[in-house]
């Protein structure tokens, strides 16, 4: 039964007229509580409050303990919290401590003299950081401040669930990558975090995202922020490793594809040459020697003299082509009768030790060693080679393709296309080993031999080998003494065109 009247057992709150505005009395010490009567619920609450104040002093050393600051005449006897009005004290004690005050401002007691406390208050304020629940916001705030706002060395990492003491033992300015073992500085942490956040915004799958941030993440301590940056930077670094591995795999596949294409091209050329040799061997016919005419001349005595025409055999370097493709030059022997006896229109020619049918004679071409052009007669080839040696310039008819950037003319449209890439900067042929790009595919094939080490072109005079056929051609000239490039001013000859250019620039400037 609750007693509402004042009696000696009632514990009254101090009033303004009964006390001076001195600071509230401190809670009873441990020595006092040890010698006092059996602890009542009020004394137990006071003991808990005393321990809480000890925690405050330990974890918040900068908290002002001056009792003269913000002293109010109305305070809670349980926790010494100050209020402006007595009604606020009553509401506070009922909500926070479960103690009810009567109309006279005294603590309502039971028959046994113990203060009345609310049994089983409604726990409507859960903690977001643990499973605890509280009956009011004040207790929840006190719990959060003491239990979850402890120093950093006791806090729990929100990212990896490891207590923060592990971050204090590590180097604050560096972290080690688990993929490559490299150590990054704090300057790289900021860059890693920025790149990680950009990837998080562009990510479309939840697997690539970090765990969702809890409400308390907005109030991270500096140690927690530093540790979070480390994890984010490490995650970004691992993604960079994956991208690099994918790029290396793509480059390796590109290299393998280029090597397969080169091997297939070489095999096709070998098959083509072998098939051509078989066709020539299978279609050979007997050599048709021009018919010899016998002319009877009478001498002075009236006798007859038989006159035989003289057959002349001369050797010329020619090249054969069955389908318009130029092949390597082979020795071709052209049989020509004496000019006194005209040869028939259809005649055979001897190729090495074989004969070539007459219907293939018109396909015999003379290939220029400096460019892909071919000619029907050696004389036409000789006139054409003067263009390369500088003895004569090509006529406008021979250079119908003009560059729109510089006005330079070319004999072939493909050559103009390659030249135009010099002005546009286009290099569509890229090396898969080093990334170097070229304007012409032949240049790329020559460059690839520097990586593979392949030297398929061997010199017949010495043991040297070359990766490019042009290099072999220039080298052979050192053995044969051939100098196809002649200076148009002093008739001096050179083995290479570059040497002629240097000579003309220095000794014969325009």
Curated annotation (Swiss-Prot):
Q: In which tissues is it expressed?
A: Isoform I is found in embryos, pupae and adult somatic tissue; isoform II occurs in embryos, pupae, ovaries, testis and to a lesser extent in adult somatic tissue.
Q: Which PROSITE patterns does the entry link to? A: ZINC_FINGER_C2H2_1 (PS00028), ZINC_FINGER_C2H2_2 (PS50157)
Listed GO molecular functions?
DNA-binding transcription activator activity, RNA polymerase II-specific; DNA-binding transcription factor activity; DNA-binding transcription factor activity, RNA polymerase II-specific; RNA polymerase II cis-regulatory region sequence-specific DNA binding; sequence-specific DNA binding; zinc ion binding
Query: Where is composition skewed (Polar residues) in this entry?
Result: 1-10
Residues in C2H2-type zinc fingers: 74-97, 125-148, 366-388, 401-423, 429-451, 457-479, 485-508
Its principal location? Answer: nucleus
Gene3D superfamilies assigned: Classic Zinc Finger
Species this protein is from? Drosophila melanogaster (Fruit fly)
Biased-composition ranges, Basic and acidic residues, are: 222-237
Name of this protein: Chorion transcription factor Cf2
- Database matches in InterPro entries: C2H2-ZF_Transcription_Reg (IPR050717), Znf_C2H2_sf (IPR036236), Znf_C2H2_type (IPR013087)
Q: Name a single GO biological process.
A: dorsal/ventral pattern formation
Signal peptide as annotated in the record: none
**Keywords associated with the record:** DNA-binding, Metal-binding, Nucleus, Repeat, Transcription, Transcription regulation, Zinc, Zinc-finger
Residues covered by region (Disordered)? 1-40, 222-279
Entry-linked Pfam families: zf-C2H2
């Amino acid at each position: 039964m609750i007693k509402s009247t004042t009696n000696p057992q009632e514990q009254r709150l101090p009033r303004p007229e009964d006390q001076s505005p001195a600071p509230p009395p401190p809670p009873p010490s441990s020595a006092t509580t040890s010698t006092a009567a059996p602890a009542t619920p009020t004394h137990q609450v006071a003991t808990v409050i005393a321990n809480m104040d000890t925690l405050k002093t330990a974890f918040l050393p900068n908290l002002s303990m001056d009792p003269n600051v913000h002293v109010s005449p109305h305070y809670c006897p349980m926790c010494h919290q100050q209020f402006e009005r007595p009604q606020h004290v009553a509401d506070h004690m009922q909500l926070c401590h479960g103690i009810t005050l009567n109309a006279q401002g005294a603590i309502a007691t039971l028959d046994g003299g113990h203060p009345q406390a609310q049994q089983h208050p409604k726990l409507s304020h859960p903690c977001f950081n643990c499973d605890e629940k509280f009956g009011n916001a004040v207790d929840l705030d006190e719990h959060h401040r003491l239990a979850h706002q402890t120093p950093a060395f006791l806090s729990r990492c929100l990212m990896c669930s490891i207590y923060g003491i592990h971050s204090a033992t590590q180097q604050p300015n560096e972290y080690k990558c688990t993929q490559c073992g490299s150590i990054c500085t704090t300057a790289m942490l900021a860059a890693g975090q920025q790149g990680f956040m950009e990837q998080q915004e562009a990510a479309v799958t939840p697997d690539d995202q970090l765990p969702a941030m809890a409400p308390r993440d907005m109030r991270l301590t500096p140690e927690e922020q530093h540790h979070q940056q480390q994890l984010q930077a490490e995650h970004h670094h691992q993604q960079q490793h994956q991208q690099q591995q994918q790029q290396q795999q793509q480059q390796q596949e590109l290299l393998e594809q280029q090597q397969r294409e080169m091997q297939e091209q070489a095999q096709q050329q070998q098959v083509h040459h072998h098939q051509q040799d078989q066709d020539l061997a299978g279609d050979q016919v007997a050599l048709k020697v021009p018919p010899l005419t016998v002319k009877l001349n009478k001498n002075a005595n009236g006798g007859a003299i038989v006159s035989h025409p003289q057959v002349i055999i001369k050797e010329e370097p020619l090249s054969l082509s069955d389908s318009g493709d130029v092949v390597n030059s082979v020795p071709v022997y052209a049989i020509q009768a004496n000019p006194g006896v005209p040869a028939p229109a259809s005649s055979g020619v001897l190729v090495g030790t074989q004969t070539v049918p007459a219907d293939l004679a018109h396909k015999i071409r003379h290939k220029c060693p400096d460019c892909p052009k071919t000619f029907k007669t050696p004389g036409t080839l000789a006139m054409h080679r003067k263009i390369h040696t500088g003895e004569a310039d090509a006529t406008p008819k021979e250079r119908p393709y003009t560059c729109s950037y510089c006005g330079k003319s070319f004999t072939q449209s493909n050559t103009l296309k390659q030249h135009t890439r010099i002005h546009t900067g286009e290099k569509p042929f890229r090396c898969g080993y080093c990334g170097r790009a070229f304007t012409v595919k032949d240049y790329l094939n020559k460059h690839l031999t520097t990586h593979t080490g392949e030297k398929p072109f061997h010199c017949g005079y010495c043991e040297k080998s070359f990766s490019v056929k042009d290099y072999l051609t220039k080298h052979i000239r050192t053995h044969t003494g051939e100098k196809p490039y002649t200076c148009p001013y002093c008739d001096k000859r050179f083995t290479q065109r570059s040497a002629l250019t240097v000579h003309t620039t220095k000794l014969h400037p325009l």
